[in-house]
Amino acid sequence: MQYSTLAGQTDNSLVSNNFGFLRLPLNFMPYESHADWVITGVPYDMAVSGRSGARFGPEAIRRASVNLAWEHRRFPWTFDVRERLNIIDCGDLVFSFGDSRDFVEKMEAHAGKLLSFGKRCLSLGGDHFITLPLLRAHARYFGKLALIHFDAHTDTYDNGSEYDHGTMFYTAPKEGLIDPSRSVQIGIRTEHSKKLPFTVLSAPKVNEDSVEETVRKIKETVGNMPVYLTFDIDCLDPSFAPGTGTPVCGGLSSDRALKILRGLTDLDIVGMDVVEVAPSYDQSDITALAGATIALEMLYLQGAKKD
């Protein structure tokens, strides 16, 4: 049996590194590969404030992606993304479970090394805190970023905790990783501070506006900056994604979210993640399927640039 040794440790997990996204064979040598995009599972959920279990998200998303692998041309796209992009799955990040500091160091180092070798990162969480070390790695490589953030929560809360999945986008502007005035948060429907100049597109507004209007606002906000795209699955209404740690009623439908994503093809998206899938609360794997579909849609955004 082959084991992942990402970050120099041997992975003996029973729930990770079994098979790849879209049935891709696992590639445990991602840095030396010829990949355009590298998928990494991030089984971390020690920063949650509600229900835990997102550490099982990568495995659930990969398992659900089997249902998507058969379709050569993902509807409504007109090409097979696997023919346009060299995509590999390098398995799950290996870190000392229970040690958040070690996780942050390993996550940032792994993403930074991939970028230095000319790869791009699609990360499967895991709770939303994983985005902070990913932003650090990407900002070091690309400079200050614009953020496109799908979520029910702004995650701009200042509670003094170093490791919390609700504080990343308070910390990231302070560290100079993102420009909040060029960043947009979509699907928000919880109380939040207005001290930071994020463009907030609330769930009621997004559901009321046309998809074209929402896409226009996103593009107008981020402009031509390098973009990091993060999708918290609780952006979707719980009827479409019950399997998550902090579900909030009144969210987006999966159809609307996918249509918005498809409108972002001409943006300079340099890194992406899908987070907060917690399969123990799921029903019939619909949340995992939503996460897998969104991840695949993100890859199609990149493939569309090859036109």
From Swiss-Prot:
Pathway(s) this gene product operates in, as recorded in its UniProt entry: Amine and polyamine biosynthesis; putrescine biosynthesis via agmatine pathway; putrescine from agmatine: step 1/1
EC number assigned by the record: 3.5.3.11
Catalytic activity: agmatine + H2O = urea + putrescine
Protein name: Agmatinase
Pfam family, one: Arginase
Gene3D superfamilies: Ureohydrolase domain
InterPro entries tied to this protein: Agmatinase, Agmatinase-rel, Ureohydrolase, Ureohydrolase_dom_sf, Ureohydrolase_Mn_BS
Gene Ontology terms, MF aspect: agmatinase activity; manganese ion binding
Key words of the record: Hydrolase, Manganese, Metal-binding, Polyamine biosynthesis, Putrescine biosynthesis, Spermidine biosynthesis
Binding residue positions for Mn(2+): 128, 151, 153, 155, 232, 234
Similarity section: Belongs to the arginase family. Agmatinase subfamily.
HAMAP family: SpeB
